[in-house]
Amino acid sequence: VDLSELEWHARRTLCFTRCRRVTVDGPVLLGAAHWTAAFFGCEDVTVKNLAIFGYRENSDGIDLVNCTRAQVSRCYIRTGDDAVCIKAMEPPPAVGGRDILVEHCTVWNDKVRALGIAGESRGEIYNIIFRRCTVLHSLADWAAEVGALCVVLCDAGTVHDIVFEQIDVLDERANGINCMLF
């Protein structure tokens, strides 16, 4: 699906809100105008074999926002912003984000984060695993809270039990690992 003719910020490409048992398998998405695959308050999400080729600011790859029980695997993500990030934009009593596995993904990001917990952290985020992924390139130059592997807490939420294992970072232009609390 070629979205490159859309104006910047025209719309999100794939957007799921408060859905259960969602599976996204195999699409190729090119030139998203805004967040490419966004899940808000979803449960039991599976994303696999997704290919994203983005270049614009705010063209996040996969954003799991206030989600529970999600798996992201075997995806290729090239973005002009975050590649795969967990976010908690709704405050409690909403679920912040929990029981999420991201594995066997290859990412390339410009501007912000390749893999991690993003600054939108208003709830409790926990039991998150990033493993066996490759960061081909990370040019994190937009702000201080950037890097290839990030945990950023800048709202009233909490973050615990976050694991990064067997992650290969081949080219990082700012911060390889960045953990910020503010």
What are these model-predicted stretches?
Residues V1-F182:
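Extracellular/periplasmic carbohydrate-active domains that bind, remodel
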